[in-house]
UniProtKB/Swiss-Prot annotation:
May play a role in DNA repair. It seems to be involved in an RecBC-independent recombinational process of DNA repair. It may act with RecF and RecO. It comes from Herminiimonas arsenicoxydans. It holds the Pfam family Toprim_4. GO terms for biological process: DNA recombination; DNA repair. Gene3D superfamilies: 3.40.1360.10, 6.10.250.240, RecR Domain 1. Belongs to the RecR family. GO terms for molecular function: DNA binding; zinc ion binding. Keywords: DNA damage, DNA recombination, DNA repair, Metal-binding, Zinc, Zinc-finger. A zinc finger (C4-type) spans 57-72. This is Recombination protein RecR. Transmembrane segments: none annotated. Residues 80-175 form the Toprim domain.
């Protein structure tokens, strides 16, 4: 028996989610159609609305529904301190620690030459422009402690130090190979407070 084309299309769409293989996608699609059609409709509306409304902040590159995000507009933030993260999820995790009061720049990825991801793909030119605006005094590199995250931090550090900026890195405490999105807030808070100059 072959699945109806619309169900096959839904299954294929669900496979695009990270960590979802063909069997999991098929189970989700069948569950939504069999047991939770209201949930399926809500999911469809939410996806459409997010795709239509969510854009990148003109200053920090994170997700927002306006030209500039609330964090960048917050006059209480320390504009001399810029934290560089890989994803909006990493930014959210740092925010939840309540230890960082500066601004952010979200790379939307990390360097990975094997996957064809280079400096342009992580918005390095935009980061350099932001970091050298005359306001930023220190750049905190909060990329993940994976091989790609470390390589990204090193590349950015060398690039910014060559322009006379102070660059620091989150202290260890975040496990090697760990991604910030999956680390508890206390560990991230300690790493932020114990960051070191690179």
């Amino acid at each position: 028996m072959k699945s109806p084309s619309s169900l096959a299309f839904l299954t294929e769409a669900l496979r695009r989610l990270p960590g979802v293989g063909p069997k999991s996608a098929q189970r989700m699609a069948y569950h939504l159609m069999q047991h939770d059609r209201d949930g399926a409709a809500m999911l469809g509306r939410a996806l459409s609305q997010a795709v239509e409304r969510v854009q990148h902040c003109a200053m920090c590159n994170t997700f927002t529904e306006s030209a500039v995000c609330e964090t960048c507009l917050d006059a209480e933030r320390n504009a001399a301190l810029l934290c560089v993260v890989e994803t909006p999820g990493d930014q959210l995790m740092i925010e939840q620690t309540l230890t960082f009061k500066g601004l952010y720049f979200v790379l939307m990825g990390r360097l990975s030459p094997l996957d064809g991801i280079g400096p342009k793909d992580i918005h390095l030119e935009k980061l350099i422009s932001r970091a050298t605006d005359g306001i930023v005094q220190e750049v905190v590199l909060a990329t993940n402690f994976t091989n790609e995250g470390e390589a990204t931090a090193h590349y950015i550090s060398e690039t910014l130090k060559a322009r006379g900026l102070k660059v620091s890195r989150l202290a260890r405490g975040v496990p090697v190979g760990g991604e910030l999105e999956y680390v508890d807030a206390g560990t991230i808070a300690r790493a932020m407070l114990d960051r070191r100059t690179t």
